[in-house]
Amino acid sequence: MRKFIIASGGTGGHFYPGFSLGKELRKRSYEVLFVVRKEDAAIKTLTKNNFNYKEINFTGFPRSANPIRHIIFCYKFIVSFWQTLGIINAFKPDVCVGMGGYLSFPVIVWAKIKGIKSAVHDSNTKIGLANKICAKFTNIFLLGLPTSDNIKNTKLVGTPIREEFGLDFNREEVLKSRGLNPNLATVLIFGGSQGSKKLNMAISKTAKKIVKKNDTVQFVHISGDKGYDKLRQEYRGCKNIRLFAYCHDIYFLMRAADFVVCRSGASTIAELYACRKPAVLIPFPYAADNHQYYNGMLLKKAGCAELFVEGDNLAPKLHEYIAGISKNKNILEFMERGYEMLELPDPLKSAEIIADTVESL
């Protein structure tokens, strides 16, 4: 039986593509071991799904000048580097796969030193620092999105998303179950795992103004736990607006919506692509290397999304744009066709494509 190590964790954007790959490799009767950060939130999901894992005490390179942070980084780097060697020596993998982020680094470097085949996956169009370094040591570099960065031996494979996005569903039932009217145009709003107060408030102002003047559109806002109480006060008495702290089946709600307002992380981009949903993208302004901006620009250039930078004028810009398209369905149809220009791999098949690739190493 062939053995695979998958370094995956830190954020949902790095973990869930790796988790999808792990499930696909297990279907093929391979043994899979995950390497994750110590006390990673991903451990709960791995345990629930009976995956073996090992923890390393690693952290990302500090981007501040604080010397204490650099000292802590150096200490954790040395410790985790040797932890990783112990994991590899004990498990004896045939292939190591890094799914992006700093966790990939020690795994991919040791794979190179020990002559083990490896692959690295980056979901973003702007390649991260750790992955740029890993690219020098790996056999093949797998791209979630096209990139202009100078990386050798690449293959465009897409970013895996949850298989639930491919399930059959009934739009009317999905909307009615949330107190929404299936006869109205539906705008879905969510901020991702790094949703912010500024984004929530700008969008709430927009939604309130639009429903006062237009009774043919409704909003469903997934706020996150932190923003929920404040927004509940904001939306009190507003018609055609539904607020939820969390949505466990966003895969149905996104497909039921006519339009989406969201961040532009790589997993969200892949989900929008799979659903062919017109969108307004508001990049998380503190993302490393501003990668969400570049992800969003890919969709904007194809005509399937608009992009606004988070700032003081966000609320009026959102209001003007969404109010305009809510009156013109032809714009939405044009934006949906824009996805055809991208010609990306099907995110619902990306896990299979990646598994085929690493299987062949």
From Swiss-Prot:
Annotated Gene3D superfamilies: Glycogen Phosphorylase B
Swiss-Prot/TrEMBL catalytic activity: di-trans,octa-cis-undecaprenyl diphospho-N-acetyl-alpha-D-muramoyl-L-alanyl-D-glutamyl-meso-2,6-diaminopimeloyl-D-alanyl-D-alanine + UDP-N-acetyl-alpha-D-glucosamine = di-trans,octa-cis-undecaprenyl diphospho-[N-acetyl-alpha-D-glucosaminyl-(1->4)]-N-acetyl-alpha-D-muramoyl-L-alanyl-D-glutamyl-meso-2,6-diaminopimeloyl-D-alanyl-D-alanine + UDP + H(+)
GO biological process: carbohydrate metabolic process; cell division; cell wall organization; lipid glycosylation; peptidoglycan biosynthetic process; regulation of cell shape
Main subcellular location of this protein, as a coarse class: membrane
UniProt EC number: 2.4.1.227
Membrane association type: Peripheral membrane protein
GO cellular component, one term: plasma membrane
Binding-site residues for UDP-N-acetyl-alpha-D-glucosamine, renumbered to this chain: T11, G12, G13, N124, R162, S193, Q292
Pathway noted in the entry: Cell wall biogenesis; peptidoglycan biosynthesis
Enzyme class: transferase
Family: Belongs to the glycosyltransferase 28 family. MurG subfamily.
PANTHER family the record matches: GLYCOSYLTRANSFERASE (PTHR21015:SF22), UDP-N-ACETYLGLUCOSAMINE--N-ACETYLMURAMYL-(PENTAPEPTIDE) PYROPHOSPHORYL-UNDECAPRENOL N-ACETYLGLUCOSAMINE TRANSFERASE 1 (PTHR21015)
Name listed for the protein in its UniProt record: UDP-N-acetylglucosamine--N-acetylmuramyl-(pentapeptide) pyrophosphoryl-undecaprenol N-acetylglucosamine transferase
Species: Elusimicrobium minutum (strain Pei191)
Gene, per the UniProt record: murG
